[in-house]
């Protein structure tokens, strides 16, 4: 099943090979992104990859986590496949993921979350789409020390961004035959900021009478998600709540190693693994490549290779269902390269 039907992508031009920025990332990034590239090639899709460095790897080589050549490449291609990037806690450079999303106005973060046969999870039949506003909220990064021991952080919510992400969510629901959009909020406490977000969602919802619209307070939504996730369909969230809830949803289906991610704007997109750099297993060749391969499938959807993307997703499902050639985190003994080869065999 296609994950991104109806999204405006970089459509193919007859006879032209699409050019895509490739950012392997840090830690296990090169291993899992390499797997995705191999699977895309095995599916018969030709892509002109422009490989660039970012994050800690780029900092060591170029003295900057976001080198000029990376930005130039992204401005040219307007689409990227990206691995995980190192972000230190409470020190160092700011998140490169957040920086790139804001720089290119990639305002919609989308994570399809589905259970997979062969993956042990507490639930069956989970089929959620988490849509997160990507450009403001506390992630605007406006914070300062007021006095020693006192720090202030500013939450920015605008009608423009809230309306834009709400319309994206409803358009997505319509294009992908979804039945319901639930706006997740904390307007009982943050009456102005979250209240504005809700009012914008409510106004947009009136334009989509065929899509059911609901609202739920974020803490209650988290409780409901871990007890009855099938009660949800498309989740619409502000930036911070979306970051937290999307990881919670990944936990319902086996973890971040099974969930792809995408960031969409009007003029481009970055497709990324949502898991971390996993430095404890980097270089050991045992990283789970599923999230990266499925993220590659999202890229193909965007490039108007939807049939090939579906073939890749089916091949991944075949390998997981069989359970014979899977990495240690899934209960197997296979290397990343061995599991990738199994997906390619299933693809053919």
Feature-to-residue mapping (PLM):
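Glycine-rich phosphate/diphosphate-binding loop of Rossmann-like nucleotide-binding domains
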Residues: 21-42, 147-219, 231-233
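Buried hydrophobic positions in well-ordered alpha/beta secondary-structure cores of metabolic enzymes
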Residues: 26-29, 78, 131, 169, ...
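Buried hydrophobic packing segments
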Residues: 36, 40, 201, 292-300, ...
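N-terminal beta-loop-helix "entrance" segment that forms/cooperates
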Residues: 46-69, 225
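Flexible, glycine/charged-enriched surface loops at secondary-structure junctions
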Residues: 47-51, 176-185, 208-216, 305-313, ...
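N-terminal glycine-rich phosphate/adenylate-binding segment common to multiple enzyme folds
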Residues: 60-155, 240
């Amino acid at each position: 099943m296609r994950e991104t039907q109806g999204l405006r992508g970089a459509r193919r031009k007859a006879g032209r090979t699409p050019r895509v920025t490739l950012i392997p990332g840090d830690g296990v990034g090169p291993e899992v992104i390499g797997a995705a590239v191999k699977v895309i090639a095995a599916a018969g899709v030709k892509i002109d990859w422009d490989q660039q460095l970012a994050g800690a790897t780029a900092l060591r080589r170029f003295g900057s986590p976001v080198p000029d050549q990376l930005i130039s490449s992204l401005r040219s291609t307007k689409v990227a496949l990206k691995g995980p990037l190192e972000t230190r806690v409470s020190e160092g450079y700011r998140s490169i993921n957040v920086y790139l999303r804001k720089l290119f106005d990639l305002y919609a973060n989308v994570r399809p979350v589905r259970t997979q046969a062969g993956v042990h999870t507490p639930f069956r039949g989970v089929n959620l789409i988490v849509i997160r506003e990507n450009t403001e909220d506390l992630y605007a990064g406006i914070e300062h020390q007021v006095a020693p021991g006192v720090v202030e952080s500013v939450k920015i919510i605008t009608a423009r961004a809230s309306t834009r992400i709400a319309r994206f969510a409803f358009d997505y629901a319509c294009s992908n035959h979804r039945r319901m959009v639930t706006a997740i909020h904390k307007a009982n406490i943050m009456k102005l900021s979250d209240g504005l977000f809700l009012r914008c969602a409510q106004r947009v919802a009136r334009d989509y009478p065929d899509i059911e619209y609901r609202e739920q307070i974020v803490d209650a939504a988290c409780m409901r998600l871990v007890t009855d996730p099938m009660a949800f369909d498309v989740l619409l969230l502000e930036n911070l709540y979306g970051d937290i809830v999307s990881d919670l949803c990944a936990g319902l289906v086996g973890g971040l190693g099974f969930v792809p991610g995408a960031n969409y704007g009007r003029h481009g997109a970055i497709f990324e693994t949502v898991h971390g750099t996993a430095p404890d297993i980097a270089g050991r060749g045992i990283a789970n490549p599923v999230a990266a391969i499925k993220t590659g499938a999202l890229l193909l959807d965007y490039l108007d290779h939807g049939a090939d993307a579906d073939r890749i997703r089916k091949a991944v499902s075949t390998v997981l269902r069989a359970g014979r050639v899977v990495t240690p985190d899934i209960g197997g003994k296979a290397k990343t390269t061995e599991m990738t080869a199994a997906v390619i065999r299933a693809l053919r």
